Regions:
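Conserved Lys-Pro-Asp/Glu-containing loop-to-beta segment of HAD-superfamily phosphomonoesterases
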Residues: 330-368
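Substrate-recognition element of Asp-dependent hydrolases with the DxDx(T/V) motif
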Residues: 260, 264-300, 311-324
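Short beta-strand-to-loop element that shapes/binds the nucleotide-sugar donor at the catalytic cleft/hinge
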Residues: 124-141
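Acidic, Mg2+-coordinating phosphoryl-transfer loop and its flanking beta/alpha structural elements
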Residues: 362-394
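Catalytic-core segments of class I nucleotidyltransferases/pyrophosphorylases
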Residues: 99-100, 107, 113-117, 130-133, ...
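N-terminal nucleotide-binding beta1-loop-alpha1 segment
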Residues: 1-19, 232-238
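Conserved N-terminal catalytic core of the sugar/cofactor nucleotidyltransferase
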Residues: 2-5, 13, 27, 31-107, ...
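Active-site neighborhood of HAD-like aspartate-dependent phosphohydrolases
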Residues: 230-274
Length: 395
């Protein structure tokens, strides 16, 4: 498998440390970050077909690194700098039909074999929960992991904390019909998702974007011998998150429970993945449409973002209800399904889509039916809330 390692930036946010060297040649424990990155590639035999794209100021650092190595990469030195996307368009003639693209300012320790085998041969990007969304490109993706929307790092309000990690699996033809110009890779993806399927591979493995002094300092304090598993919360909606006295079919009826807001605020310091799994039988009964549900959830997230600078990362919805006799009911949803709680298929899907560690998941709901699917999927921490999130029972 060919790997394109992109190191074209000047690292201005890390000056003066990067005045004459690329970011990945900064040292941690007397070892360059590139040394760690290269070791990870070797572990999965991804070092043999390596292309390094850099600029003329930094080229010699890579030449020196590989002087005594058996496998020599192709080093492309370019000036002027075209941006992460423009550089790929300019050099696509050197790429194989399928390849992995990695940004040089990402410290990573991931299972590349698992990533490559996910959605075999399809365009995909490793995504993760970011704690610095203000300077990250963030995304929405659907239950099939297809990326549906990208929020540019320049956008002020973002309704997602899931960001692009800087590691891609791409087919060369994604650059077809693109003219050479200065452009970021995220903007190319933004254009392509309109008519091309690009998948998100969510990983709970740790990624560090060390592109600022503050984040570089944090990276230096970390231990690298273990991959950290991130916390995840699966939260029920009605009766746990919002009041369920009246059927919620309009934004006017959304009323957050005070104890939920108190609890949700505490989550911010842990930066966990937050998933909402909710039964919405009103869709099958004809009380509300999928489109209206999505509008409600967008509004709900907007309110959380404004109040707490935090939001739900993804909503999983079961629209089914088998009992018939409702005026305006939708026949295709009048079935016995495997996703309506207490059934567990949406929990399994969330587990699969996000590569979760069940020991690190907290499942929270106000009914026993919310607890059962957690237990079925081996979640260790199932919390039944009794009116308030402060008084709860761990099952």
């Amino acid at each position: 498998m060919q790997v394109i390692f992109q190191s074209g930036g000047l690292g201005t946010r890390l000056y003066p440390e990067t005045l004459n060297k690329p970011k990945c040649f900064l040292k941690i424990n007397n070892k360059t970050i590139f040394n760690y990155q290269y070791s990870e590639l070797k572990k999965y035999n991804l070092h043999k077909k390596l292309i390094i794209i850099t600029n003329k100021k930094h080229e010699q650092h890579f030449i020196n690194f590989f002087k005594k190595k058996h496998n020599k990469p192709k080093i492309i030195s370019e000036d002027p700098i075209w941006g992460s996307g423009g550089s790929m368009i300019k050099n696509k003639k050197f790429f194989q039909k399928k390849f992995i693209l990695i940004y040089s300012d990402i410290f990573f320790k991931i299972n590349f074999k698992k990533f490559i085998n996910f959605k075999k041969d399809k365009n995909k990007i490793i995504c993760h929960k970011s704690n610095h969304v203000f300077d990250s490109d963030t995304i929405f993706f659907d239950k099939n992991n297809r990326i549906t929307k990208i929020f540019s790092k320049k956008e002020k309000i973002k309704l997602s904390n899931i960001s692009l990690s800087g590691i891609y699996f791409l087919n060369k033809n994604i650059f077809n019909k693109l003219r050479l110009k200065k452009i970021d890779m995220a903007n190319i993806i933004k254009k392509k998702i309109k008519n091309k399927v690009i998948y998100s591979y969510y990983s709970s493995e740790e990624f560090f974007d060390f592109g600022t002094k503050k984040r570089l300092l944090k990276l230096k304090k970390e231990k690298f011998n273990k991959i950290k598993k991130k916390l995840a919360f699966i939260i029920d909606r009605d009766g746990t998150m919002i009041d369920e006295k009246n059927y919620v079919n309009s934004i006017r009826k959304i009323k957050f429970l005070k104890d939920f807001l108190f609890f949700f605020k505490q989550l911010k310091k842990f930066n966990p993945l937050i998933i909402c799994i909710t039964n919405q039988s009103g869709i099958s009964k004809g009380f509300i449409t999928y489109k209206q549900i999505h509008k409600l959830h967008k509004f709900l997230n907007l309110k959380l973002q404004k109040k707490l600078k935090l939001n739900i990362d993804v909503f999983y919805i079961c629209p089914h209800f088998p009992e018939k006799g409702f005026k305006g009911e939708v026949k295709k949803y009048k079935i016995k399904c495997s996703c309506r709680k207490p059934q567990s298929s949406l929990f399994k899907l969330a587990n699969k889509n996000y590569n979760l560690n069940t020991a690190k998941i907290y499942n929270i709901g106000n009914n026993i039916s919310d607890m059962v699917p957690g237990i079925k999927t081996n979640i260790k921490n199932n919390i039944l809330v009794n009116r308030t999130l402060k008084n709860n029972i761990i099952i």
